[in-house]
Regions:
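N-terminal segment of the canonical double-stranded RNA-binding domain
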Residues: 1-15, 20
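Short, charged, surface-exposed hinge/linker loops at domain edges
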Residues: 1-5, 35, 39-63
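A short, exposed loop/beta-hairpin motif centered on an aromatic-Gly-Thr core
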Residues: 25-36
Length: 63
């Protein structure tokens, strides 16, 4: 099963790592390490999908 592409990058401004899923608009998370940002992103992804279902918003498939 295919999963969403994830970007992780260091933000000088935030002094930490940001992880995001481009296919899920505004789905991102912050962490002090790349691993922490990824862990937080998994939580954010689940919440994003749950909220989309609750609002009747289609969830785009992974590309």
């Amino acid at each position: 099963m295919k999963d969403y592409n994830i970007n992780i990058f260091y933000s000088e401004e935030d002094e930490g790592y940001i992880a995001d899923i481009p296919d899920l608009k505004f789905c991102s998370a912050f962490g002090s390490t790349p691993e922490e940002a990824l862990k937080e992103l998994q939580i954010a992804k689940a919440a994003w999908i749950e909220a989309a279902h609750a609002e009747g918003i289609p969830v785009p498939p992974p590309r």
